């Protein structure tokens, strides 16, 4: 709401920028003022914010400081094209298009279940028919003239929805689409409604996307971003920090698709545990605190924030063991994780066995191994609640990835058609990797990657 366009849009109803956003008149029942419809925000409360100067509301599907651009207005789409050209001419490699399936709304912005005071209006703004048309317009008028990459992102995206946008051919409008389902293995819909980690649920999510997109589109692979806690603290183990950090890296990066690495992930950055709730700033965290405080004691609310806040992944990058983790000589926008003395780029760069150097090795391996790039995907042992095992196969060569998600010792055995003695161990996070009777006992959070052929 601090952008020049928006400031202009709220000056008057006939301002040229007024229709750059979804401004609608207030409704009145007697003297009672009501918003234009009953849609709720994705964060909390209603999706409309009142402006007394205009006696109108503007639409914000997320925070009130994030008014929705009216992409249904052709003038706005032309502005977006100019922005794209500006950055592409500056040399950027592409764009991550946030909640891209929300960019078109049902004409008239009708209420959902009009008799209800509030309702989720997603049916009127998610995956509307014009979304594909607008993205095709961007691709035709701008992106096709550059060597660039575009990845889309949006909640509740299924493989079938993604294929509308990423299927190879003339209807392709995005290079990849980010999925969320594998990040729901320890929660119900949102990180702030936790449940015990379910490895089978995570595996099903990965496998579904791998198989559904095979031969049709390309996967966007990730396990960390700015909207989730740190992955070692979440799906791995801080006790087995190095082992689980390496295992998680190979687990997702060796699947079929393009791996995304979030800042700090490559050095194994962990969640931050601040001593007081008022030290947190994020709007989603504060909304969760307000709701949780109604049903939970303060200590449990603080523990929930420690485990689930997005700010776990928004602490300054840990470059060295110097002040402010070497990020800046000035005070940064948020607290530095106190473990920067031991988890930082400079120290890990000098340590051949570090998580950072494992990521480098893993990237080299993926880039130089056609099976890891182009191979088909097949999950093995889908019923296991402790091991995630899958294979990739390409031109007669087979790659097998074995990942332990527990601190327990687990016996792993392969069928006779797989002979581990004839395979090359190409990646591992432990030394002394013995094979006994065509199998082995996995150590806590162990990783092994074997290659045949």
Predicted regions and their residues:
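Beta-strand-rich binding/interaction modules
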Residues: 409-430
């Amino acid at each position: 709401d601090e952008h020049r366009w928006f400031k202009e849009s709220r000056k008057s109803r006939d301002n040229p920028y007024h229709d750059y956003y979804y401004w609608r008149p207030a409704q009145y029942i007697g003297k009672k003022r009501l918003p234009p419809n009953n849609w709720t925000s994705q964060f909390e409360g209603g999706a409309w914010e009142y402006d007394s100067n205009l006696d109108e509301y503007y639409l914000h599907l997320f925070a009130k400081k994030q008014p929705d651009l009216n992409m249904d207005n052709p003038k706005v789409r032309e502005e977006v094209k100019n922005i794209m050209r500006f950055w592409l001419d500056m040399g950027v490699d592409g764009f991550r298009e946030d909640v891209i399936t929300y960019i078109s709304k049902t004409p008239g912005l009708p209420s959902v279940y009009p008799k209800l005071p509030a309702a989720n209006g997603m049916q009127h703004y998610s995956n509307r028919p014009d979304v594909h048309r607008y993205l095709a317009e961007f691709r035709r008028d701008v992106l096709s003239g550059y060597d660039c990459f575009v990845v889309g992102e949006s909640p509740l995206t299924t493989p079938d929805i993604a294929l509308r946008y990423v299927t190879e051919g003339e209807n392709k409008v995005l290079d990849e689409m980010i999925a969320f389902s594998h990040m729901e293995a320890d929660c119900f819909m949102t990180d702030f409604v936790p449940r015990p980690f379910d490895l089978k649920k995570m595996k099903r999510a990965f496998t579904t996307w791998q198989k559904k997109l095979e031969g049709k589109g390309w996967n966007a692979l990730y396990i960390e971003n700015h909207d989730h806690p740190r992955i070692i603290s979440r799906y791995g183990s801080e006790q087995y920090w190095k082992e689980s950090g390496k295992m998680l890296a190979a687990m997702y990066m060796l699947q079929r698709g393009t791996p995304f690495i979030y800042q700090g992930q490559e050095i194994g950055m962990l969640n931050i545990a601040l001593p007081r709730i008022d030290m947190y700033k994020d709007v989603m965290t504060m909304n969760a605190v307000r709701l949780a405080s109604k049903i939970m004691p303060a200590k449990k609310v603080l523990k929930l924030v420690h485990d689930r806040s997005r700010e776990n992944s928004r602490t300054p990058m840990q470059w060295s063991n110097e002040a402010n983790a070497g990020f800046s000589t000035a005070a940064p926008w948020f607290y530095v994780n106190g473990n920067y003395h031991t988890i930082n780029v400079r120290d890990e760069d000098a340590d051949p066995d570090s998580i950072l150097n494992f990521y480098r090795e893993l990237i080299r391996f993926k880039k130089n191994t056609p099976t890891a790039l182009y191979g088909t995907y097949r999950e093995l042992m889908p019923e296991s609640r402790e091991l995630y095992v899958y294979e990739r196969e390409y031109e007669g060569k087979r790659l097998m990835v074995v990942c332990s998600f527990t601190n327990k010792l687990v016996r792993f055995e392969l069928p006779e058609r797989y002979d581990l003695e004839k395979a090359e161990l190409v990646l591992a996070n432990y030394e002394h990797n013995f094979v006994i009777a065509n199998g082995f006992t996995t150590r806590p959070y162990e990783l092994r990657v074997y290659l045949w052929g």
